[in-house]
Amino acid sequence: MSMTDPIADLLVRIKNAAAVGKPTVKLPSSKIKVAIAQVLKDEGYITDLRVTATENNKSELEIVLKYFEGRPVIETLKRFSRSGLRQYRGKTELPKVLGGLGIAIISTSKGIMTDAQAREAGVGGEVLCFVA
C-alpha cells in the first residue's frame, strides 16, 4: 500500500487511538516517525516507544500513549506542513503554540526538534506539526 503522507498517518493514528482510550498504537516504522515519537516522549506527551522487527525486513513502531485522570495528555495534534504545501520558517519566524503551552515539531538541518530547541540552536526549518 502506498502512503503519500506518513507523518499525517502517524498523527492521525495517535489522535484516533487517544480518542477511544487505547493504551498503544502500532504502525509501520520509519526514521522520521521514530524521531517525531522521540520528541513526543521527551516532551512528556507519550509514555514510551518501541521499534520491533517484523517479517520481510520491516520494522514496527509501537507508541504507548499517556493519560492523566482518564483523559489523553495530547489534546491537539495537527499537521501543519503537508506534502502539497510545505511550510518553512526561519529561526525568527518559528511559531509558538498556545503561547508556549504546546510545541511545534520542526524538521531542521540538525534533526527533528521542538520549536524551543530550534530557537535555542538558531536554526529554522519545516514546521511539521503542532502538539498541545
From Swiss-Prot:
Keywords: Ribonucleoprotein, Ribosomal protein, RNA-binding, rRNA-binding
GO cellular component terms attached to this protein's record: ribonucleoprotein complex; ribosome
Gene Ontology MF terms in the entry: rRNA binding; structural constituent of ribosome
GO biological process terms, semicolon-separated: translation
Xref: PANTHER family: 40S RIBOSOMAL PROTEIN S15A (PTHR11758)
Family classification: Belongs to the universal ribosomal protein uS8 family.
Gene: rpsH
InterPro entries assigned to the protein according to its UniProt record, in alphabetical order: Ribosomal_uS8, Ribosomal_uS8_CS, Ribosomal_uS8_sf
Coiled coil start-end: none
Highest rank taxon of the organism: Bacteria
Name listed for the protein in its UniProt record: Small ribosomal subunit protein uS8
Subunit note: Part of the 30S ribosomal subunit. Contacts proteins S5 and S12.
Pfam families for this protein: Ribosomal_S8
Function: One of the primary rRNA binding proteins, it binds directly to 16S rRNA central domain where it helps coordinate assembly of the platform of the 30S subunit.
Origin organism lineage: Bacteria, Pseudomonadati, Pseudomonadota, Gammaproteobacteria, Lysobacterales
